[in-house]
Regions:
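Glycine-rich, low-complexity intrinsically disordered segments
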Residues: 1-188
Length: 188
């Protein structure tokens, strides 16, 4: 079937196009006292960009006489989840992400002038109860697609560049989160 402009515009007029700037993020921290630095609702509001992560099916070559094909095997792999946050004046967002990482591997301890002991926390402490939910909203604000990421933790927190040349524009910090899996929790 050849491309038809009238059919295309009819579909757009009927169903509309999705806008990437209509979304909500909800983060449930592990129960480790992080909300004393910044309440979950405030961090959620400061989220500037989010990704709806993808999934890759692992495959391996299957070679039979004459025909070669890739066949699926094993569990899927999931792309990391990246969120970018606006920073408030006192950098509470950066401090919270740093504190969460410090729970995972203690590298700075205010009670010990020599730094942390680099002990790694138990997985259940920093990730087991953590959930990030990203909801894609319609133009009217109705949820149309909802992903829930389970057992999340910040693997990477970006550096923040300071510059005398930049006089406007808000400061931002990005974090890349690892998670065990995601699932579609959209209500039909």
């Amino acid at each position: 079937m050849a491309f038809n402009v009238e059919n295309f515009t009819a579909i757009i007029a009927d169903k509309g196009l999705s806008s990437s700037n209509k979304f909500e993020v909800a983060i449930a921290f592990p129960s480790t006292g992080l909300t004393s630095i910044l309440p979950e609702t405030e961090l959620n509001l400061m989220c500037d960009t989010a990704t709806i992560a993808g999934k890759t099916i692992q495959s391996t070559p299957e070679i039979h006489y004459g025909v070669r094909r890739e066949v699926a095997y094993n569990a899927p792999t999931f792309d990391p989840l990246t969120l970018t946050f606006y920073c408030t004046e006192k950098l509470a967002e950066k401090k919270l992400l740093d504190a969460w990482q410090n729970i995972i591997v203690q590298h700075s301890n205010p009670e010990n002038g020599n730094g942390g002991n680099f002990n790694v926390a138990y997985y259940d402490t920093y990730a087991k109860s953590s959930i990030i939910t990203i909801t894609k909203l319609s133009v009217s604000g109705e949820p149309v697609y909802k992903h829930e990421y389970r057992e999340v933790y910040p693997k990477t927190v970006s550096a923040i560049e300071l510059s005398h040349a930049t006089s406007s524009g808000p400061m931002k910090v990005s974090a890349t989160f690892n998670y065990i899996y995601w699932k579609d929790v959209t209500q039909s």
